[in-house]
Amino acid sequence: MQRKHLLIASAVLAAALIAAGCASVPSPAELDAQAVTMIKSSFRDQGIAKLARLEQDLGQAACSGDKPPADDVAKRVEAEALASIRWPAGGQYLGDWREGERLAQNGRGMTWSDASAAPAGNGAQCYNCHQIDQKEISFGTIGPSLWNYGKLRGVKDVADPASAAIVQYTWGKLWNSKAYAACSNMPRFGHAKLLDEQQLRHLMALLLDPKSPVNQ
């Protein structure tokens, strides 16, 4: 009888401990807060790299969870991103494709060791994620191939009204990629002031100019 009482007492104690353990498990919100605190404590301001970079806007926060954002949130992210696009002055979309290729090859910029965060010191590092010119054998595959980008889309003259939609889409994608895909992995070159208007024109020329090797 005494043994039976001991077993019952042990079972009750075990159940109580389990219940207490379950009750002490942090909520998802608490875990998120702990993670943010840990991340912030692991970094410091260094040169041009500031802790402010850890602050997320709506689009970043919405796409950092374990599930895709709800449709209404994704639509809001895209709408706000589309509204943020600044179209090129004078409707001038194209620059020099040669400069665009240099930017596409250049992965420099925005590190703590860089003297300035100004766009002039930044590259676009397009080849990290895309194939562009087939002569380049080193490229990433996170993004789609951009080989023959303009040619495949029938762009023969960027001033032709028939090409307006793809020209404007391409500019918008470079300026703020979240305008067309809420959780796009592509850098928001214009929105984040990573590149200036003229640099974006050069990238546009690389992709759309019929004379660019990309479209041969």
Positions of the model-derived regions?
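Local sequence-structure signature of Cys/Sec-based thiol-disulfide redox active-site neighborhoods
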Residues: 113-124
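Residue-level detector of alpha-helix boundaries and kinks
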Residues: 7, 84-86, 188
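Secretory-pathway/luminal and periplasmic proteins that interact with or process carbohydrate-rich
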Residues: 110-113, 135-139, 213-214
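Core hydrophobic alpha-helical transmembrane segments of single-pass membrane proteins
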Residues: 11-17
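Post-cleavage N-terminal segment of exported redox proteins
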Residues: 17-110, 173, 206-216
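Extracytoplasmic electron-transfer domains, predominantly the class I c-type cytochrome c fold
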Residues: 30, 34, 38-44, 95-99, ...
